[in-house]
Curated annotation (Swiss-Prot):
Name under which the protein is recorded: Ribosome-binding factor A
Tree of life domain: Bacteria
Pfam families in alphabetical order: RBFA (PF02033)
Source organism per UniProt: Bacillus cereus (strain ATCC 14579 / DSM 31 / CCUG 7414 / JCM 2152 / NBRC 15305 / NCIMB 9373 / NCTC 2599 / NRRL B-3711)
Subunit structure: Monomer. Binds 30S ribosomal subunits, but not 50S ribosomal subunits or 70S ribosomes.
SUPFAM superfamilies the UniProt entry points to: Ribosome-binding factor A, RbfA
Main location: cytoplasm
Length: 118
């Protein structure tokens, strides 16, 4: 069953990216990238991880806009993917990109300090 949940998650990720970028006209929603979709084993719940280009205020506004459009997004997913029941969608920020950027910055600082000591 886990394999099917992964396949549904990947398909939802592709469709959500298209729906958010082309179908939703809410001005609160900025530049959003769907980074991952985790679907439960029974295909009832889908956690959608997103990254947003912008500051904290823009991220919060985007999350509010997506929450407002959740019903529309779910109905679009239901039309595009044939499932008995369309999963309930929740949106969360993907902090891994920020962590990766922070680690990259720290590694560059360490590298600079190492060259100065030589």
């Amino acid at each position: 069953m886990k394999l099917r949940a992964n396949r549904v998650g990947e398909q939802m990720k592709k469709e959500l990216g298209d729906i958010i970028s082309r179908k939703i006209k809410d001005p609160r929603i900025g530049f959003v990238t769907v980074t991952d979709v985790q679907v439960s084993g029974d295909l009832q719940i889908a956690k959608v991880y997103i990254s947003v280009l912008g500051d904290e205020e823009q991220k919060e506004n985007t999350l509010k806009g997506l929450a407002k459009a959740k019903g529309f997004i779910r109905s679009e997913i239901g039309q595009r993917i044939r499932l008995r029941k369309t999963p309930e969608i929740t949106f969360e920020f993907d902090e891994s990109i920020g962590y990766g950027h922070r680690i990259d910055t720290l590694l560059h600082e360490i590298n600079k300090d190492g060259k100065r000591e030589e």
